[in-house]
Curated annotation (Swiss-Prot):
Pfam families referenced in this protein's UniProt entry, alphabetically: Ribosomal_S20p
Gene Ontology cellular component terms for the protein in this record: cytosol; small ribosomal subunit
Signal sequence, renumbered to the chain: none
Domain of life of the native organism: Bacteria
UniProt protein name: Small ribosomal subunit protein bS20
Lineage of source species: Bacteria, Pseudomonadati, Thermodesulfobacteriota, Desulfuromonadia, Geobacterales
Native source species: Trichlorobacter lovleyi (strain ATCC BAA-1151 / DSM 17278 / SZ) (Geobacter lovleyi)
Length: 87
């Protein structure tokens, strides 16, 4: 356990940030899962709608630094490609 006041404060800050980041990552995964489920059920309209909702969430998560911008770009690219396979 930390003994210095500043170290104790840092631990508290890190716990708060960790919880916030975990929540954002979990939300992100949920939106990505919705797109994949819509594609698996072969529902093009639902897949496109889910993708349009997921893309801003992915971008915002990258902007906040929770995931790397290349990771976000790759996710958007792969999901778009997946939705486009429905024709």
């Amino acid at each position: 356990m930390a003994h210095h006041k500043s170290a104790i404060k840092r631990i508290k800050q890190n716990e708060k940030r960790n919880a916030r980041n975990r929540h954002q990552k979990s939300t992100l995964k949920t939106y990505i899962k919705r797109v994949r489920e819509a594609v698996e059920s072969k529902d093009k309209e639902a897949a496109v709608a889910a993708l349009q909702v997921a893309i801003p969430v992915i971008d915002k998560t990258a902007t906040k630094g929770v995931i790397h911008k290349a990771n976000a770009s790759r996710s958007v690219s792969r999901l778009t490609k997946l939705v486009n396979t429905l024709g």
